[in-house]
A protein has these predicted regions:
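N-terminal segment of the mature folded domain
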Residues: 20-118
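Bacterial N-terminal signal peptides that target proteins for export
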Residues: 1-8
């Protein structure tokens, strides 16, 4: 019995230190497709270096409002990067994310902004 218990304990410890394969889904708006293709590759390499875990990021792109509706209707997004705070607010109003999402990260949870030039 002791050998079995010791073997099981070693197996549990070994499993906990093995690298993990992580799958994430980023639900985003159309113009960010190429940006996130590049960013995801860089992030995956960084994550692997820091943790030893492999992370694969799938992307879903469409109009910002349509993507918000997809999340509201149940698409299992791990990350939401939409064009308008209004769209993210709609997700929060339906209880899919915390209503205080904008205060969660620096810069009102907006890692970048864009400027329109005429």
């Amino acid at each position: 019995m002791k050998k079995w218990s010791l073997g099981f304990a070693v197996l549990l410890v070994s499993a906990s230190v093995m690298a993990k394969d992580i799958q994430l889904l980023n639900v985003s708006y159309d113009p960010t497709r190429e940006l996130y293709e590049q960013y995801n590759k860089a992030f995956s390499a960084h994550w692997k270096q820091q943790t030893g875990d492999d992370v694969a990021i799938r992307q879903s792109h469409g109009g910002s409002g349509k993507q918000a509706t997809s999340v509201i209707n149940g698409i299992d997004a791990d990350v939401v990067t939409l064009a308008l705070a209004y769209d993210v607010d709609a997700i929060a109003e339906r209880g899919r994310i915390d209503k205080a999402w904008i205060k969660r990260l620096p810069d009102n949870s907006a890692p970048y902004t864009s400027t329109i030039v005429f």
